[in-house]
């Protein structure tokens, strides 16, 4: 679910989503410059405090202009954890250079929105280095207190069963446009999937993977009862609400 704000997306979404392609090239994500927090230090930092991190861009939502200033929201990760960098000011030209794997240093403030920990008011610097994370399988952590420790990481869910959602008319369907079924083509997709007798909700965030992407099309083709594997980012909104970037029907 999005924050309640009017978003004027500029042009076509500029995606650098891991699931949408791009070659993985490795760097040592454990190295930190002087004065930069480790992930453990960032995790322990108080909300509203200034934080300084180094991480690698894994994906971006669409660049747009907010009150005349270009901004982009970034999913970033290092060896030990992940970061959600919200509406970072950046020009369109510079944003286009932030491809998946790019190393950045970010200074901003730690904040929280409905359980999602993020960095706001961010300033960035591009550094040498490149790293694209492999998906961490967190299927066994669903429903446990340990899942939140992986918040914002690129993760995988395996062997899950598509469960019915109910649309605005009360019909059972495999997915919804928007969380309540009130949307249309191009909006976020919501769908339910279960494992070990428990059902969870997953989202295709349209600002991350729009209607022209493989994952958006794949979710629209799901059938109730399908067994699927998924990859995406472990976003939080009043509980776990993963932003899915890849779906494979078994």
Residue ranges and their predicted role:
Residues 16-19:
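C-terminal motif of bacterial Sec signal peptides marking the signal peptidase cleavage site
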Residues 1-11, 22:
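Positively charged n-region of N-terminal signal peptides that target proteins for export
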């Amino acid at each position: 679910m999005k924050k309640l704000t009017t978003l004027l997306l500029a042009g076509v979404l500029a995606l650098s989503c891991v699931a949408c392609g791009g070659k993985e090239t490795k760097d040592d994500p454990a190295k930190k410059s002087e004065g930069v927090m480790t992930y453990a230090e960032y995790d322990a930092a108080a909300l509203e405090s200034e934080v300084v991190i180094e991480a690698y861009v894994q994906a971006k939502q669409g660049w747009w202009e907010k009150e005349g200033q270009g901004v982009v929201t970034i999913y970033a990760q290092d060896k030990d954890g992940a970061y959600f960098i919200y509406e970072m000011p950046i020009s369109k030209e510079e944003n286009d250079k932030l491809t998946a794997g790019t190393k950045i240093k970010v200074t901003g403030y730690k904040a929280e929105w409905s359980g999602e920990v993020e960095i706001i008011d961010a300033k960035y610097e591009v550094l040498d280095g490149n790293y694209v994370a492999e998906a961490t399988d967190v299927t066994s952590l669903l429903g446990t207190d340990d899942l939140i420790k992986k918040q914002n990481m690129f993760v995988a869910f395996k062997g899950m069963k598509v469960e019915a959602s109910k649309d605005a008319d009360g019909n059972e369907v495999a997915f919804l446009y928007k969380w309540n079924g009130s949307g249309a083509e191009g909006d976020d997709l919501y769908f339910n999937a279960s494992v070990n007798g428990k059902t969870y909700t997953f989202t295709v965030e349209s600002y991350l993977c729009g209607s022209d992407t493989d994952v958006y099309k794949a979710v629209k083709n799901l059938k109730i009862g399908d067994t699927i594997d998924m990859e995406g980012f472990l976003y939080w909104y009043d509980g776990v609400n993963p932003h899915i970037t890849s779906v494979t029907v078994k």
